[in-house]
From Swiss-Prot:
Residues 1-15 form the signal peptide. Keywords: Calcium, Carbohydrate metabolism, Chloride, Disulfide bond, Glycoprotein, Glycosidase, Hydrolase, Metal-binding, Pyrrolidone carboxylic acid, Secreted, Signal. SUPFAM superfamilies: (Trans)glycosidases (SSF51445), Glycosyl hydrolase domain (SSF51011). Ca(2+) binds at N115, R173, D182, H216. One of its GO terms (cellular component) is extracellular space. This is Pancreatic alpha-amylase. Binds 1 Ca(2+) ion per subunit. Binds 1 Cl(-) ion per subunit. It is found in: Secreted, Extracellular space. Changing R352A: Abolishes chloride binding; has only slight effect on activity. It holds the Pfam family Alpha-amylase_C. The gene is AMY2A. It is an enzyme of class 3 (hydrolase). Chloride binds at R210, N313, R352. Its EC number is 3.2.1.1. The lineage of its organism: Eukaryota, Metazoa, Chordata, Craniata, Vertebrata.
Length: 511
């Protein structure tokens, strides 16, 4: 009996690393700045049937409404209260979305902004998404309520009160991140208010949280908050399920704060992943795809079972956050599809796909002066995500998750889940291939010359549909067909000028 009890407790201890997705669903998508009503529809009409595991939603709590510049995306990272009331929708719409998505097996993960409230320079008043009064100057947030006692002003030792030196781990945690009022997370009252907010979301039915700015919180303070959280709603989750936790920690090396400091609380965002993969696919600094043979921990990344991975995120696709110029985004569509394809085929980490909106980029001295621009809107009201006849999105919503090449690789990852990384091939340059056991195989040509070779796929004999160039529809293939012989070998030809210079086949794409 002791043995069973031990297993029982271990199961609960490890729960925050598990994404709580339905069996066979292995990726989530960040529907950045989408309205709750559009997410609910997308769960039903697209995400569920296409095998997506869940959605990371933008912060659902009340934030400052900023008009200079006009309604920037980053206003949502400046909380005013924990009321569920934003440009994405109100609490009723949020509840409706969570219910409808869970009912079709698609989970909701909340971007939780709990390190801070709004900036200290914001004017007092009711310029907030729900009309709540707040006064940053006097540290007064009556809608929570928080007062001057609940902030770290007294603990911060820098002259400005802001973080001035990232080599000082204490000020990174106890001072203000770019002027944002830093909550005193060691106080039980503050921890309780945050846990109350997160428990409200858990009770509604969310499956987990991205913890924004985790690097700026002490790991022990995060743990104290997590220890107060409810189990997930048993309408949709097994009894005793814990919320999935992934912490935003930017650790590119060279600073005292390490991702590993946070492993006790949950997974961490591995920012090295997209930065390095972008450098490789762009072939910068002499990097080659052949070097990806030991991708993952071999590149100095966090352990696979602690990693939340992505090619780009809402910050670094516009030059914020971490990764710099190497980050690939939808603006670099051809290379981007290859990078996302590689990520979704490779077993390392838990994968998140980005879904963006277009904005008018304007570079001056190498910087995008429009990096602040918020989502498509009419006078500040977020525009509907319209769906075009060809299944792409309108109204300047990019919907990368609907691109055939990306959607089909989300399915590929589901099909090969649990299979080993096998049958690696490289030409010493930028032509590489690998398999996932006997369930899938993928080939890339990122060289400036064509690729034509017979490779061992590890797959059963038969005719397969390449899910990059087309789809398997009613037993037919709209793209390239690949013939695997009895010995598991197949011939692949990929021109370096192909629209998408990669091919992927899997057990479910067999004709």
């Amino acid at each position: 009996m002791k043995f069973f009890l031990l297993l029982f407790t271990i199961g609960f201890c490890w729960a925050q690393y598990s994404p709580n997705t339905q069996q066979g669903r292995t990726s989530i998508v960040h529907l950045f700045e989408w309205r709750w009503v559009d997410i609910a529809l997308e769960c039903e009409r697209y995400l569920a049937p296409k095998g997506f595991g869940g959605v990371q939603v933008s912060p659902p709590n009340e934030n400052v409404a900023i008009y200079n510049p006009f309604r920037p995306w980053w206003e949502r990272y400046q909380p005013v209260s924990y009321k569920l009331c934003t440009r994405s929708g109100n609490e009723d719409e949020f509840r409706n979305m969570v219910t409808r998505c869970n009912n079709v097996g698609v989970r909701i993960y909340v971007d939780a902004v709990i390190n801070h409230m709004c900036g200290n320079a914001v004017s007092a008043g009711t310029s907030s998404t729900c009309g709540s009064y707040f006064n940053p100057g006097s540290r007064d947030f009556p809608a929570v309520p928080y007062s001057g006692w609940d902030f770290n002003d007294g603990k911060c030792k820098t002259g400005s009160g802001d973080i001035e030196n990232y080599n000082d781990a204490t000020q990174v945690r106890d001072c203000r991140l770019t002027g944002l009022l830093d909550l005193a997370l060691e106080k039980d009252y503050v921890r309780s208010k945050i846990a109350e907010y997160m428990n409200h979301l858990i009770d509604i039915g969310v499956a987990g949280f991205r913890l924004d700015a985790s690097k700026h919180m002490w790991p022990g303070d995060i743990k104290a908050i997590l220890d107060k959280l409810h189990n997930l709603n048993s309408n949709w989750f097994p009894a005793g399920s814990k919320p999935f936790i992934y912490q935003e920690v930017i650790d590119l090396g060279g600073e005292p704060i390490k991702s590993s400091d946070y492993f006790g609380n949950g997974r961490v965002t591995e920012f090295k992943y997209g930065a390095k993969l972008g450098t490789v696919i762009r072939k910068w600094n002499g990097e080659k795809m052949s070097y990806l043979k030991n991708w993952g921990e071999g590149w100095g990344f966090v352990p696979s079972d602690r990693a939340l991975v992505f090619v780009d995120n809402h910050d670094n696709q516009r030059g914020h956050g971490a990764g710099g110029a190497s980050i690939l985004t939808f603006w670099d569509a051809r290379l981007y599809k290859m990078a996302v394809g590689f990520m979704l085929a490779h077993p390392y980490g838990f994968t998140r796909v980005m879904s963006s909106y277009r904005w008018p980029r304007q570079f001056q001295n190498g910087n995008d002066v429009n990096d602040w621009v918020g989502p498509p809107n009419n006078n500040g009201v977020i525009k509907e995500v319209t769906i075009n006849p060809d299944t792409t999105c309108g109204n300047d919503w990019v919907c990368e998750h609907r691109w055939r090449q990306i959607r089909n690789m989300v399915i590929f990852r589901n099909v090969v889940d649990g299979q080993p990384f096998t049958n690696w091939y490289d030409n010493g340059s930028n032509q590489v291939a690998f398999g996932r056991g006997n369930r899938g195989f993928i080939v890339f040509n990122n060289d400036d010359w064509s690729f034509s070779l017979t490779l061992q796929t590890g797959l059963p004999a038969g005719t397969y549909c390449d899910v990059i160039s087309g789809d398997k529809i009613n037993g037919n293939c709209t793209g390239i067909k690949i013939y695997v012989s009895d010995d598991g070998k197949a011939h692949f030809s990929i021109s370096n000028s192909a629209e998408d210079p990669f091919i992927a086949i899997h057990a479910e794409s067999k004709l």
